[in-house]
């Protein structure tokens, strides 16, 4: 969600600092955004928590939901996004590297 919100801010011409200041002082505030925003701004995707590990954890959570016969709509959507980032070569990078894939998907043909 953070990545999609930041990509939308980019598309609207809102700079990253303004986005960060608004979101972190509102109901959108969250620890992941606070912890990863500097890495995103610097495009520093050295792994703190590798994207491959996010995929593994999401797959385990999905399997648990399936075994319990519980719906997992948002989990599956997130898993698809992280798998796409894996296929784009981001697996060994920090999980925040998913923002680059989202940004690339949102680029308009010039």
Which residue ranges define each predicted feature?
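Helical "substrate-binding/catalytic lid" subdomain
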Residues: 1-105
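ATP-dependent carboxylate/acyl-activation modules
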Residues: 109-110
């Amino acid at each position: 969600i953070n990545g999609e919100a930041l990509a939308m801010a980019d598309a609207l011409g809102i700079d990253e600092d303004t986005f960060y200041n608004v979101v972190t002082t509102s109901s959108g505030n969250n620890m992941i955004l606070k912890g990863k925003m500097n890495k995103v701004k610097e495009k520093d995707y050295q792994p703190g928590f590798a994207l491959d590990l996010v995929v593994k954890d999401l797959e385990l959570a999905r399997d648990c939901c399936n075994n319990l016969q519980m719906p997992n709509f948002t989990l599956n959507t997130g898993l698809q996004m992280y798998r796409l980032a894996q296929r784009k070569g981001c697996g060994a990078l920090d999980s925040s590297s998913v923002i680059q894939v989202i940004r690339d998907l949102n680029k308009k043909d010039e």
